[in-house]
């Protein structure tokens, strides 16, 4: 009796266990069904002729471990652990290319991503099929930060073409790619030289002074002014900008692309990124406001003045113009942030490689002495007579590749690339780092060797496969400015100083810090005046 009675609920007991178990069972059944349907969908995608790649997991795809806490990531993906925690994603993707081929794919959730790892596939996609491969992916994190405006992240189409055409022609008007910009760069170097001399023979980090100088050249074009290196607001904005680019690829921030409201979480990198955005926005909008108040239609001083005048002209012609103060803000942000960070890191890599290779540095010094001397300021007209110096800069760019995965592209329609089916809306990553370390193109690709850019007569070789600024319709708009800054600033630095690592210091890590750009790890140098 007792045993039988024990199987029945006692009198007055609330029988709630059964319904709860049914609810849990139903939820598990739905989850299992979702996983099964997702698995079937992924199998159909793989069977549709897309490029090969690692087997995705249901719901999360291949890189779902990025959404997990670090201690849970081990052995999650392909049983190999989180290798991207110790190497940059560009390096890890290059390793995957050895397994799956130069065109391979993976999934982030349901999002198909195709990686192009050799020059031929990148050229075919970005040049020969430029109209198809020139769009930008719609990602919530980028959309929140840029409102899909500006130049770098805006969608490819008539509005983007119009804005880019105006921006490029206006920058050229103020000296982009012309000798008229030289005096501004040389003038800025005088401040760099003075700052470096303050340290005497003591070790120091070259990052702040180089960042200030490069940013000021952008400021002279866009804002019509330079900022003193001691300006607290300017220094704060540069620090925020550098930090923002570094954390934008923080694995937790990827959650925003799945749940956009995560951007507003009051902790961690979410809170930090919002503060960075607020400070940079305030800085740039104040500058635009000052220009609106002082605008002289007969005497435009800089890019902002020209844009404001053009905006008014367009509004007078028609109501539906795409030129407005909001779009100006995002274009200025693109020029200021992208233009500062990439060139700053390129120059820092140059100083690091010179410090590690005194023999190369000596040859650069000798060529400068022979062509320019120690008293005259360098000029772009000297480039043709300085092939070794130019080759040295190019070799640093090849090895450092400050934008290793370019900016992601997206297909605007279904297409075929080297026999593989590429669906509409596919994210495309050109692995520029992989191209510039390709042993098929570059002999001993990991060695620092400026001579690879010189012919038997010591003259500069123009190599088609050297594409640090990308190729196609989305090629970096600031390429000409960056080349001017790199040459004039690097030659000025080499003309004035000899750079070395502090005595007894360890060799810096040369893999770089992976973010939206590949920055060198913090390092110190000593300088001796020449």
Curated annotation (Swiss-Prot):
GO molecular function, one term: oxidoreductase activity, acting on paired donors, with incorporation or reduction of molecular oxygen, reduced flavin or flavoprotein as one donor, and incorporation of one atom of oxygen
Keyword Endoplasmic reticulum carried by entry: yes
Any GO CC annotation of this UniProt entry: endoplasmic reticulum membrane
Record-listed heme binding positions: 476
Main location: endoplasmic reticulum
Cofactor: heme
SUPFAM superfamilies tied to this protein: Cytochrome P450 (SSF48264)
A GO biological-process term: xenobiotic metabolic process
Membrane topology: Multi-pass membrane protein
Domain of life, source organism: Eukaryota
Record field: transmembrane: 21-41, 99-119, 247-267, 328-348, 481-501
Keyword Signal: no
Tissue: Specifically expressed in thymus and brain. In brain, expressed in cortex, cerebellum, olfactory bulbs, pons and medulla and the limbic structures (at protein level).
Role summary: A cytochrome P450 monooxygenase involved in the metabolism of arachidonic acid and its conjugates. Mechanistically, uses molecular oxygen inserting one oxygen atom into a substrate, and reducing the second into a water molecule, with two electrons provided by NADPH via cytochrome P450 reductase (CPR; NADPH-ferrihemoprotein reductase). Acts as an omega and omega-1 hydroxylase for arachidonic acid and possibly for other long chain fatty acids. May modulate the arachidonic acid signaling pathway and play a role in other fatty acid signaling processes.
PANTHER family reported in the protein's UniProt record: CYTOCHROME P450 2U1, CYTOCHROME P450 508A4-RELATED
Family: Belongs to the cytochrome P450 family.
UniProt name for this protein: Cytochrome P450 2U1
Organism in which the protein naturally occurs: Rattus norvegicus (Rat)
């Amino acid at each position: 009796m007792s045993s039988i009675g024990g199987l029945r609920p006692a009198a007055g007991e609330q029988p709630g266990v059964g319904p709860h178990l049914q609810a849990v069972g139903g939820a598990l059944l739905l989850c299992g069904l979702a996983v099964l349907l997702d698995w079937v969908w992924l199998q159909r995608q793989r069977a549709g002729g897309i490029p090969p790649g690692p087997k995705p997991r249901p719901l999360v795809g291949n890189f779902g471990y990025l959404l997990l806490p670090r201690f849970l990531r081990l052995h999650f993906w392909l049983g190999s652990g989180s290798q991207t925690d110790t190497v940059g994603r560009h390096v890890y993707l290059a390793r995957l290319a050895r397994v799956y081929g130069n065109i391979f794919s993976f999934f982030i959730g349901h999002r198909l991503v195709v990686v192009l790892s050799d020059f031929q596939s990148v050229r075919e996609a970005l040049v020969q099929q430029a109209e198809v491969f020139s769009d930008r992916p719609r990602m919530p994190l980028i959309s929140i930060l840029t409102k899909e405006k500006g130049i770098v992240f805006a969608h490819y189409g008539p509005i983007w073409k119009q804005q880019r055409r105006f921006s490029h022609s206006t920058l050229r008007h103020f000296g982009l790619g012309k000798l008229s910009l030289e005096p501004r760069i040389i003038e800025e170097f005088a401040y760099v030289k003075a700052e470096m001399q303050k340290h005497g023979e003591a070790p120091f980090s070259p990052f702040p002074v180089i960042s200030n100088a490069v940013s000021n050249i952008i400021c002279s074009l866009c804002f019509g002014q330079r900022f003193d290196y001691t300006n607290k607001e300017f220094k704060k904005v540069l620090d925020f900008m550098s930090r923002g680019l570094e954390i934008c690829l923080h694995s937790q921030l990827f959650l925003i692309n799945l749940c956009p409201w995560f951007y507003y979480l009051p902790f961690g990198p979410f809170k930090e990124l919002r503060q960075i955005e607020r400070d940079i926005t305030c800085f740039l909008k104040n500058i635009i406001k000052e220009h609106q108040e002082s605008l002289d239609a007969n005497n435009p001083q800089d890019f902002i003045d020209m844009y404001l005048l053009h905006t008014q002209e367009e509004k007078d012609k028609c109501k539906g113009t795409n030129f407005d103060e909001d779009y100006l803000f995002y274009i200025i942000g693109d020029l200021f942030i992208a233009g500062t960070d990439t060139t700053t890191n390129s120059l820092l890599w140059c100083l690091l490689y010179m410090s590690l290779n005194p023999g190369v540095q000596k040859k650069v010094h000798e060529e400068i002495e022979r062509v320019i001397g120690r008293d005259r300021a360098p000029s772009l007209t000297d480039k043709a007579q300085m092939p070794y110096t130019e080759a040295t800069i190019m070799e640093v760019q090849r090895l450092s590749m400050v934008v290793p995965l370019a900016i992601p592209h997206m297909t605007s329609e279904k297409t075929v690339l080297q026999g593989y089916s590429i669906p509409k809306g596919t994210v495309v990553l050109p692995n520029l780092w992989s191209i510039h370390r390709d042993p098929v193109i570059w002999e001993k690709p990991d060695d620092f060797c400026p001579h690879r850019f010189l012919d038997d007569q010591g003259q500069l070789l123009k190599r088609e496969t050297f594409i640090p600024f990308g190729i196609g319709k989305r090629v970096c708009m600031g390429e000409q400015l960056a080349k001017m800054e790199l040459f004039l600033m690097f030659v000025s630095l080499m003309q004035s100083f000899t750079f070395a690592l502090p005595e007894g210091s360890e060799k810096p890590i040369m893999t770089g810090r992976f973010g939206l750009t590949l920055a060198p790890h913090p390092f110190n140098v000593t300088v001796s005046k020449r």
